[in-house]
UniProtKB/Swiss-Prot annotation:
Tissue expression pattern: Expression appears to be maximal in germinal vesicle oocytes, it tails off through metaphase II oocytes and is undetectable following the completion of the oocyte to embryo transition.
Disulfide bonds: none
Induction: Induced by hydroxyurea and etoposide.
Effect annotated for changing R5K: In HYDM2; uncertain significance
Compositionally skewed regions (Polar residues) per UniProt: 156-170, 177-194
Disease connection: Hydatidiform mole, recurrent, 2: A disorder characterized by excessive trophoblast development that produces a growing mass of tissue inside the uterus at the beginning of a pregnancy. It leads to abnormal pregnancies with no embryo, and cystic degeneration of the chorionic villi.
Protein name, as recorded: KH domain-containing protein 3
Stored InterPro entries: KH_dom_type_1_sf, KHDC1, MOEP19_KH-like
Domain annotation KH: ranges: 40-103
Effect in UniProt of substituting T156A: Decreases recruitment of RAD51 to DNA double-strand breaks, PARP1 activity and ATM-CHK2 signaling resulting in a decrease in DNA double-strand break repair
Listed result of changing T156D: No effect on recruitment of RAD51 to DNA double-strand breaks, PARP1 activity, ATM-CHK2 signaling or DNA double-strand break repair
């Protein structure tokens, strides 16, 4: 497990029987308004690491400004990189209370910002998913409609083709067959009757010619 991290600009706590306050980083000397007895009663605040970084910066770069304006000293231990951080506030009791109140107000503000951003992202995801669902439904519906139209048009075209074949085939063929049959029958009948009629006509004529001389005598 990694050792607790201390920001480079934070006050080093005085150990029991110990040594005067040592200020690290950007604070090279002790504050004139800070007294060593303030180290005995720190106020402790626990916050999520990401909130501490939002308030004081990732490396604690805003802490010197807060300390100078509030006349307090701040020590931060990051207990768990993904969990909580411990903030110790040293100074006059009234200044401690004001500083802790300010820290908690800033924490609430950043929580609200994160919740708002998460809610906006969630709403955007829902809207995107809804739009995709509607688009898929429209595409499926249009594909089904187009398929129905194609099937209906194919059926109609097939019916027209069948009707045209039936209409053109039956009446024309029947009429042509009937006409041809009538002509053949008439021709045959005429061919068969002509020799008989001619023979009868010749016979009748010879008979008449045979009677005429007698009648004339």
């Amino acid at each position: 497990m990694d050792a607790p991290r201390r920001f480079p600009t934070l006050v080093q706590l005085m150990q029991p029987k110990a040594m005067p306050v040592e200020v690290l980083g950007h604070l090279p000397k002790r504050f004139s308004w800070f007294h060593s007895e303030f180290l005995k009663n720190p106020k402790v605040v626990r916050l999520e690491v990401w909130l501490v970084e939002k308030i004081f910066g990732r490396g604690g770069e805003r802490i010197p400004h807060v300390q100078g304006m509030s006349q307090i000293l701040i020590h931060v231990n990051r207990l768990d990189p993904n969990g909580e951080a411990e903030i110790l506030v040293f100074g006059r009791p009234s200044y401690q209370e004001d500083t802790i109140k300010m820290i908690m107000n800033l924490a609430d503000y950043h929580r609200q910002l994160q919740a708002k951003g998460s809610g906006k992202a969630l709403a955007q995801d829902v809207a995107t998913q809804k739009a995709e669902t509607q688009r898929s439904s429209i595409e499926v519906r249009e594909a089904g409609t187009q398929r129905s139209v194609e099937v209906r048009e194919a059926g109609t075209q097939r019916s027209v083709e069948v009707q045209e074949v039936g209409t053109q085939g039956s009446p024309v063929e029947v009429q042509e067959a009937g006409t041809q049959q009538s002509l053949q029958a008439a021709n045959k009948s005429g061919t068969q009757r002509s020799p008989e009629a001619a023979s009868k006509a010749v016979t009748q004529r010879f008979r008449e010619d045979a009677r005429d001389p007698v009648t004339r005598l």
